[in-house]
Swiss-Prot record:
UniProt keyword terms in alphabetical order: Cell membrane, Disulfide bond, Heme biosynthesis, Iron, Membrane, Metal-binding, Oxidoreductase, Transmembrane, Transmembrane helix
Residue positions binding heme o: H61, H123
Primary location group: membrane
Function: Catalyzes the conversion of heme O to heme A by two successive hydroxylations of the methyl group at C8. The first hydroxylation forms heme I, the second hydroxylation results in an unstable dihydroxymethyl group, which spontaneously dehydrates, resulting in the formyl group of heme A.
Membrane spanning residue stretches: 7-27, 63-83, 92-112, 122-142, 160-180, 212-232, 244-264, 272-292
InterPro entries linked: COX15/CtaA_fam (IPR003780), COX15/CtaA_HemeA_synthase (IPR050450), HemeA_Synthase_type1 (IPR023755)
Compartmental location: Cell membrane
Originating species: Bacillus cereus (strain ATCC 14579 / DSM 31 / CCUG 7414 / JCM 2152 / NBRC 15305 / NCIMB 9373 / NCTC 2599 / NRRL B-3711)
GO cellular component, one term: plasma membrane
Comment on protein domains: The N-half (TM1-TM4) and C-half (TM5-TM8) domains are connected by an intracellular loop. Each domain is formed from four-helix bundles and they align in a pseudo twofold symmetry manner. The N-half domain is the substrate-heme O binding domain and the C-half domain is the cofactor heme B binding domain.
Protein name: Heme A synthase
GO molecular function per UniProt: metal ion binding; oxidoreductase activity, acting on NAD(P)H, heme protein as acceptor
Segments on the Cytoplasmic face: 1-6, 84-91, 143-159, 233-243, 293-311
Length: 311
């Protein structure tokens, strides 16, 4: 059964990643109304008779979201049953399921009633939490923490501050990026790093949305760079923290490069999807570090108790 659960966890993680990228594809191609205003049917039909490209993209996104719902539900039930001895299992299972349902309902509401771009931008963030929760469940199932000896990990308050702070802030950056997509502001500023050669400062809403995201992205790049330097200096003996921050910096660098290329490639589809891919992976890595940070407090108490007993 454990072998089956491992395969299920991997397939579910991949399916949720496809759902995330599919949502970005729907937004990028303007396929949100590919099935009209009907849900769960497509243009009022179970199998649509008129298959335009927008309909195919929207319908594919709905099908992958539906399969993700089934897989996440099954994974939550099995992990709850067979891995309940691991402290975070139940919390992650609940988060995975609840946020997936919230994402599906919000997507359906956007189709039927329509939503403001500021509200639609939350849709990607909700999906991201479900994805990260499933990734963490997968890590627990594969016992990644044991391989990195994470059970004995103890972090100082400074490192935990950076882990929690960067993760929360990354969610804000994700929201600003999603807002750029839904406001159709990807090409509002044709230059980089300033908005335009003729107008370095933004003058209208779409330019402010674009430049706000750029500033937020630059700040998270600098913050992760600083945290990585701390990890390299002080956590070489803790490989999970050491490599966690190095991987985070690699991902945020790739994210930044692709973000610039989105501007200079006229918002090409490939760059837009890579932009969503890298931030999804980065958020999952940061959430894993958060989980380790919560364990660190427990590990410190256990170490202190053991020390008192030996005395």
């Amino acid at each position: 059964m454990q072998r089956f659960i491992k395969w299920l966890a991997v397939i579910t993680s991949l399916d949720l990643l496809i759902v995330l990228l599919g949502g970005a594809l729907v937004t990028k191609t303007g396929s949100g109304q590919g099935c009209g205003k009907s849900w769960p049917l497509c243009n009022g039909e179970f199998v649509p008779s008129n298959l335009s490209m927008e309909t195919i993209i929207e319908l594919s996104h709905r099908l992958t979201s539906g399969s993700a719902g089934i897989l996440v539900t099954l994974l939550c039930i099995l992990s709850w049953k067979y891995y309940k001895h691991v402290r975070e299992t139940k919390t992650l299972a609940i988060l995975s399921f609840v946020f997936l349902v919230a994402q599906a309902l919000m997507g359906a509401a956007a189709v039927v009633w329509g939503q403001m771009p500021a509200v639609l931008a939350i849709h990607f963030g909700i999906s991201l939490i479900s994805f990260a929760s499933v990734i963490l469940l997968t890590c627990l199932i594969f016992e990644i923490d044991q391989k990195f000896d994470a059970r004995s990990l103890i972090m100082d308050k400074k490192m935990k501050f950076h882990i929690y702070g960067v993760t929360i802030y990354s969610y804000i950056v994700v929201y600003t990026g999603a807002l750029v997509r839904h406001e159709r502001a990807s090409l509002a500023c044709p230059d980089f790093p300033l908005c335009s050669k003729n107008r370095p400062m933004p003058t209208q809403l779409h330019e402010w949305v674009q430049m706000g995201h750029r500033v937020a992205a630059m700040l998270i790049f600098a913050w992760i760079l600083y945290a990585m330097i701390l990890a390299i200096r002080h956590y070489k003996q803790q490989p999970v923290v050491y490599w966690g921050w190095i991987i985070s910096f690699i991902l945020v660098t790739l994210q930044a490069v692709v973000g610039v290329l989105v501007v200079f490639t006229n918002a090409s589809l490939a760059m837009a999807l890579l932009h969503s891919l890298f931030i999804s992976c980065l958020f999952a890595v940061l959430c894993y570090l958060v989980m380790l940070g919560t364990r660190s407090k427990v590990n410190a108490k256990e170490a202190e108790l053991t020390s008192k007993q030996t005395k």
